[in-house]
Amino acid sequence: MAANYGISTAALRSQLMGLINFTGTHKDQADKYRQLLKTVLTNTGQELIDGLRLFVEAIVNEHVSLVISRQILNDVGSELSKLPDDLSKMLSHFTLEKVNPRVISFEEQVAGIRFHLANIYERNQQWRDAATVLVGIPLETGQKQYSVECKLGTYLKIARLYLEDNDSVQAELFINRASLLQAETNSEELQVLYKVCYARVLDYRRKFIEAAQRYNELSYRKIVDQGERMTALKKALICTVLASAGQQRSRMLATLFKDERCQHLPAYGILEKMYLERIIRRSELQEFEALLQDHQKAATSDGSSILDRAVFEHNLLSASKLYNNITFEELGALLDIPAVKAEKIASQMITEGRMNGHIDQISAIVHFENRELLPQWDRQIQSLCYQVNSIIEKISVAEPDWMDNLN
């Protein structure tokens, strides 16, 4: 054996055959396999590939004791992680293929190789391939017992990888598996990661108000970096704006409007107009649109973008506070959409209980039901108080001495 100069395929095959019939102790036999593996790794190019393939085939052979083959396959897994990605990926797949007939005997070793393969795919942004490799690990059904933290972390990673591949359906499947485990761990880091993934799944699935609530919760978690907390708050604001108009969104708008941190976000202007129930024009949405992710720019069933649909509904609710009734034509002009579309949106919101009113088809008029005035006045007074407080705070910063004299 020439440890410093590699080994030929013929010589390797001969030595492997000799080791099968080795009569010494398991420890001595394992040491000889390790020395032979070390020699194979000194090869280069095709000789390295051929040598490792031959070595793997030999050690997973049923004639080699499991005590030995498991140890040496662990060593092979460690060495695979040191090779260049392309070479390591090819040899990892080869190893998994050869082990497959006896996979139950090598669960731990196979899992290690799969985790390694997933990291390679992830580094190369091959998200779906990385997820698929991890899905192949029998976390619940295998003989090996995995810790709650390992299973939870793996499910969350699979969900995140599917999200990166824009497959929210598969991501939700693994988030649901993770949800059964997240209460069993004391790891705050994993719990936060679960909440992040869950919020993203809700976001991708267009369950915007639920996503906004989760993002808003994350924005208060001390374990999360300050910059990440502000990112979560921004996402909460974006999802709230994109959500369907109704009581849930109104409550979320109020929560965010009262959060002083939101005043520093680029989308604050839209938040303010929505909370104060003001009409929003299409020209005012350009800055907000630039904040949207690709999945948030998708079209709805009527061809409108998600944002346009949300703004149409908001403007319709705002109009219901200004008018007792309005014709389809006037409503369409107010919302800057065709009258037929305006009628359809109004009809849907009334049917779903998100707006009070009724439609007179014969007269082509939407009638808005009278609201109690006191709650409206309360909101308007509350809004005015917030704005006055904001002005006072700005004066205090700019002219503290003048404010002291007033006191």
Curated annotation (Swiss-Prot):
PROSITE patterns for the chain: PCI
Coiled-coil regions listed = none
UniProt keyword Electron transport, yes or no? no
Any one GO molecular function term: transcription cis-regulatory region binding
Limits of the PCI domain: 204-373
Which GO BP terms sit in this record? Answer: compound eye photoreceptor cell differentiation; female germ-line stem cell population maintenance; germ cell development; male germ-line cyst encapsulation; negative regulation of proteasomal ubiquitin-dependent protein catabolic process; oogenesis; protein deneddylation; protein stabilization
Gene3D superfamilies attached here? Winged helix-like DNA-binding domain superfamily/Winged helix DNA-binding domain (1.10.10.10)
**What is the protein's major site of localization?**
cytoplasm
- Top-level taxon in the UniProt lineage: Eukaryota
Q: Which Pfam families match?
A: CSN4_RPN5_eIF3a, PCI, PSMD12-CSN4_N
A cellular component term, taken from the record's GO annotations:
COP9 signalosome
Task: Report quaternary structure and partners.
Answer: Component of the CSN complex, probably composed of CSN1b, alien/CSN2, CSN3, CSN4, CSN5, CSN6, CSN7 and CSN8. Interacts directly with CSN7.
Q: Which PANTHER family match?
A: 26S PROTEASOME NON-ATPASE REGULATORY SUBUNIT 12/COP9 SIGNALOSOME COMPLEX SUBUNIT 4, COP9 SIGNALOSOME COMPLEX SUBUNIT 4
Q: What is this protein called?
A: COP9 signalosome complex subunit 4
- Tell me the organism: Drosophila melanogaster
- Taxon lineage: Eukaryota, Metazoa, Ecdysozoa, Arthropoda, Hexapoda
